[in-house]
Amino acid sequence: MEEIVLNTIKKYNLINNGDKIVVAVSGGPDSMCLLNVLKNIREKFNLELFVAHINHMIREEADSETEYVKQYCEKNNIKCFVKMANVLEMAKQQKRGTEEMGRIVRYDFFNYVANKVFADKIAIAHTENDNAETVLMNLMRGASLEGLKGIEPIRGKFIRPLIECSRDEIEAYCEENKLDPKFDKTNNDNIYTRNKIRNLLIPYIKKEFNPNIVESLNRLAVLARQDAKYFSEIVKNEYKNLVIFENVNKEKHNIIDKNTNIGTSQEENENQKNGDITELNDINKTNIKETVEQQIILDLKKFNKLEYVIKSRVLLYTINKLLGTTKGIEKINVEDMIKLCEKNIGNKYLIPNKNVKIFIKKGKVFFIKL
């Protein structure tokens, strides 16, 4: 097991000598395996380890799991940070699903601890099986190449040293090392989509179609990541060729023509429907001076010469650069944006996710952050 993890660390350059690492630990087999492996190799890499544990206050066993994690850390001289979070109440207040709320709370806490101890990395115990489940779930949703990448071994500060380890290998390691991890019984409840995929769909595929489906899905994820990386480089280069003006900071630049109304009233925002192309009211008649904080402008003529597959990626890249996310942007929104550009529709605009306004003016494509 430790050899597999060391190979993964080397392959993806997950850890550097002297790193401070926050390990996300629930007390289950995956996270306890991860913590124990990192504990065993910490001298090899001169690591400083910290544990971040959240008690979601949902299950009766939660308190005993918290105590178990604290005792392990005390025994092995690892500083442990614990957060008590009433996830059910928080989800109710914020009108979110319990799963979503739990994830938000966890990652907020991991980042908080990382900032507090000046950590270089945050280690998450995602496994080969988790990755297979994610790829299959995204595939069924009709995901693009990005969705087929699955769970990446490294993304920013977050590293996943167990991503090439199977769940069977992890449970065997826990037994061999007498870790006595705590099992979350809710993982057996086939209520959530992921649990259904894990407990019902993948075992069925293994039995009836492909006994190596987990390995196959992980191989697909690797290939998708390779292809996505190739496209990413192409898109970055095309963006550099297309961009006329870029201000993604909060410094103000008054560069819009004075007779271009780029303002959007609150009433207009409330009436927008995702994907709709809406008339830009009096775009050539309004004589106002407007200062725009954050925006990107692309060359329309050059954009329209691109292949469709690159156009869609350039649009998403541009929006992500402006907003820091493409959440809420669906396939139909991308199609509408391309249509707006190809037909050079100069008296209409799009607000695809209520956070960005897109329109054409004098041979340019404007992306305005709202």
Question: What residue ranges belong to the model's regions?
Answer:
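Non-catalytic, well-ordered alpha-helical scaffold segments
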Residues: 32, 133-134, 195, 199, ...
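Core alpha/beta nucleotide-donor-binding catalytic domains of modification enzymes
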Residues: 1-25, 29-202
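AMP-forming adenylation/ATP pyrophosphatase catalytic core
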Residues: 2-30, 42, 48-50, 105, ...
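Alpha-helix boundary/capping and short turn/kink residues
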Residues: 141, 145, 207-214, 229, ...
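Non-catalytic, surface-exposed connector residues within folded enzymatic/regulatory domains
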Residues: 63, 92, 191, 211-214, ...
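Mid-to-C-terminal catalytic subdomains of enzymes
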Residues: 177-215, 222, 355-356, 363, ...
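Hydrophobic/aromatic residues within well-ordered alpha-helical segments
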Residues: 65, 106, 166, 197, ...
